[in-house]
C-alpha cells in the first residue's frame, strides 16, 4: 500500500500532466484528493459536512422519487425551474423544487449546475441517478436500511442483556429480518435485486481469473448437476458459466429464496439455466453436484448461521464435489472503503 505522501506526489504529477489513469492509479488519486481535503478542512467544516450527510441522502432520494434526474437527462441543455416542475412525476411545486435544485447544485454534491438564475443543467454525476441500475442503491439504502442505520446508536448503547438481535429489529419491531421484509415488499425486493445486479457487475468476479470448468470432470452427462449457484440472486454467475459451457453437457442451477422478475426468469431460461427456490438453511436437495458456489453470502450472516449454511453444503457433497466461496475479506488494519459494508451488515443483518 502506497504512503499518503507518495499518493500526493502522484496527484501533483497527474495535475501537471492529466491522462487516463488505470484502475489502481485512479483509486490512489481519489485517496490523495480526499487526504488533501481532510487536511484543509477546518473543524467547523468537518462538523457541518457530517451533520448534513443525512440531509444529502434525503435530498437525492427526493429527486429520484420525483424523476428529476431523468427529466434533466432527456436533453443536454438548461431547463427552467418551471419546466422541470411540470416534467417531474408527480409534479412538484416550483418553489420547493427550486430549493431542492439549489441544494443539489452545492458542493460537494454537484449533481446539477445552475447555469443562470432559475436555469439548471445536468452533470455527469447527476446523470448517474437517471439510470435505474445506479439509483436503486440510493433508494434501497434510504428506504429499507435508513431506519436501521438511525437505530444503530440506540442499539449499540443498549446493555448486552437488553439488546435486540439487530438494529433492524429496533427500527422494524416484529418484522423479523431484513430478508424476511424483502419477501413481503415487492417494490423493495425489485429495488434490492436491481442494486445487487449492479454491484455484481462492478465488483471483482472470480470467474474472470478462475476457470470453473477445472472442477467439472470430463464425461459428465446431460443429467449431471455441474454447478449450483446457492443464493445466486438473478443468476449472473450461472449465466457467466453458461457462456463458457455452450454445447457442453450438464445442468447449471440457480438457487435463491427470493422471487425474481419475469425478465430475469426468461434470461435464465434462454441460457438453459434452471431456477430452484431454496433456503440455504434447509437441506440441499441437489446431492453430489460438481460445484457448489457461494458468492458474497456469508458477510450478511453471523458466524453461527454461516456454520449452518456450510453444514448443509457439506452434507450434500461427495468426494468429487468442490465448494467455491467468493467473499469479501477485510484486513484488521488499513481496510478498504468496503469496510462500510461491515457496518451495513451490523445495522441490517447483525453480522
Curated annotation (Swiss-Prot):
Binding-site residues, S-adenosyl-L-methionine: 231-232, 279-280, 295
PROSITE patterns (UniProt xref): SAM_OMT_II
Presence of the UniProt keyword S-adenosyl-L-methionine in the record: yes
This protein's UniProt keywords: Methyltransferase, S-adenosyl-L-methionine, Transferase
UniProt EC number: 2.1.1.-
Technological use: Apicidin F, like the other known apicidins, is a cyclic tetrapeptides with anti-malarial properties via histone deacetylase inhibitory activity.
One GO BP: methylation
Superkingdom of the organism of origin: Eukaryota
InterPro entries in the cross-refs: COMT-like (IPR016461), O_MeTrfase_dom (IPR001077), Plant_O-MeTrfase_dimerisation (IPR012967), SAM-dependent_MTases_sf (IPR029063), WH-like_DNA-bd_sf (IPR036388), WH_DNA-bd_sf (IPR036390)
Active-site residue list: 299
Pathway entry: Secondary metabolite biosynthesis
GO molecular function, a single term: protein dimerization activity
Disruption phenotype: Leads to the loss of apicidin F production.
Induction text: Expression is positively regulated by the apicidin F cluster-specific transcription factor apf2 that binds to the eight-base-pair motif 5'-TGACGTGA-3' called the 'Api-box' that is found in all promoters of the apicidin F cluster except in the promoter region of apf2 itself.
Family statement drawn from the similarity comment of this UniProt entry: Belongs to the class I-like SAM-binding methyltransferase superfamily. Cation-independent O-methyltransferase family.
Function text: O-methyltransferase; part of the gene cluster that mediates the biosynthesis of the cyclic tetrapeptide apicidin F (APF). The non-ribosomal peptide synthetase apf1 incorporates four different amino acids to produce apicidin F: L-phenylalanine, D-pipecolic acid (D-pip), N-methoxy-L-tryptophan and L-2-aminooctanedioic acid. L-Phenylalanine is the only proteinogenic amino acid directly used by apf1. The 3 other apf1 substrates are non-proteinogenic and have to be modified by other enzymes of the cluster.
Protein name as catalogued: O-methyltransferase apf6
Species this chain originates from: Gibberella fujikuroi (strain CBS 195.34 / IMI 58289 / NRRL A-6831)
Chain's gene name: apf6
